[in-house]
Amino acid sequence: MSKMPPSYTSTTNACKLCKPLGASLAFRGIEGAVPFLHGSQGCATYMRRYIISHFNEPIDIASSSLGEKHAVYGGSANLKLGLNNVTKKYNPQLIGVATTCLTETIGDDVKRIISEYKAEFYNGEKPCKGEKSFELGKSFKLEKSEIDKVSKRDPYIISVSTPSYSGTHIEGFHAAIKAVVEQLTEPAGLINEIHASPDDIHTLEDTFPVTALTRESVNFMPGFVSAADLRYLKEVLTDFGISFTLFPDYSESLDGEALNDYPLIPSGGTPIENIKKMGWAKITIECGSTLPKESAGTALAQMYGTPLYRTSLPIGIRETDKLMDKLEEISKREIPARYRSARGRLVDAMVDGHKYLSGKRAIVYGEEDLVVGLTSFLAEIGIKPIICASGGKSGQLNQAIANVVEGLAPLPQVYEDVDFYDIEERAESLDIDILVGHSKGYAFSRKKGVPLIRVGFPIHDRIGGQRILHLGYHGAQMLFDAITNTIIAKKQDDSPIGYSYM
């Protein structure tokens, strides 16, 4: 009798996004950068559509536009041609190249291809000797008309491996940040002022001494948060009088002002010169409870000895208190009065709204670090998290959730690497009052008949997802009001009487 194959159910309504999307978002947080996907045109189109739908901002993501023949013969020539085109048309300071499933599967050596491209193209002195395309084993060279001099200031090119089958968008986001740190930061003492010389050799005349940010600045890497969160963090650090490098910073490049003319590369982003000096900061603060062991912060610590402090996302009172205490220690200043007052108002609001929230039950889903932060906050305000779920699979979620609910709420059911089919199946017999997560849970919310509190990414069915503030006392206040009013509205709508006073 033959052995039956194991039963298998494909992913149904995934609770995660693909790895190159996260890398594209991270690269967009660098000043003058253009994200570039080495793969098929469809990958870049999908990323653009998804990001635009949430941020309501245009975003260009370049592509090497591989087709069927490149899956057989390789995409080297397309990558080189694409890099040259982006450099000529956009004049970027940096190009962030992220791989896709296709190029990882066929085995393209992206680092080698980029190295060849620099030798062939940079400073416009050497024509590209790479193969333009391949057909039946026959090679074709680039025509002279296709070879133009690139920018006078050749862009940095950062590469990162991000096949979708190896992780989620959050892993791609962190992988891109780590790649930038490893490939762009430079030793203290002398920092290169130019990008490349003809022989890629720098002399003392090409450099300048590190001064302004050396051992005085703080590296702050908050992870994947909203544009409003990034602006808030910059305000906090400024109010503490701290010189800082916030990386990545897409608070303006993905949530900018209305302009008369469309810029090819929007303003905003972490300045490249600041990134180059990150290894010589006073300390690195990295936010996240489920970060990879090998992160950008650990890379800086290993490469330059930069002290690393890790903390959870500052959502709610306890986690924000931890961050404020650390900033007090670093700045040697007391917490500014505006944040002390905001904390007091939040506590007062929690007392006022406790009668509406006590004992309510919630399902929280989304990115692992956000789920941990939201679970901590819900436990603080008297709501019992029943299920905490994520499409990520760091292996750290269960312990992180246990840490934040200890002493406040029973340990919820915690699930990693799940989709919405799994979440619905586990929640079928449970009595819940609210869902907390992104828009992809709306179908479940409608089916279950419970309201959805929209947070995180993506938010496609409401406007202003990029402006939702989650962090700090101010963010907690906004979340508290939204949750409380949603529960009141649900009770009001369900009442046959229609009370106007609750």
For the regions a protein language model found, what residue spans apply to each?
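An N-terminal assembly and electron-transfer interface module characteristic of large anaerobic redox
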Residues: 1-502
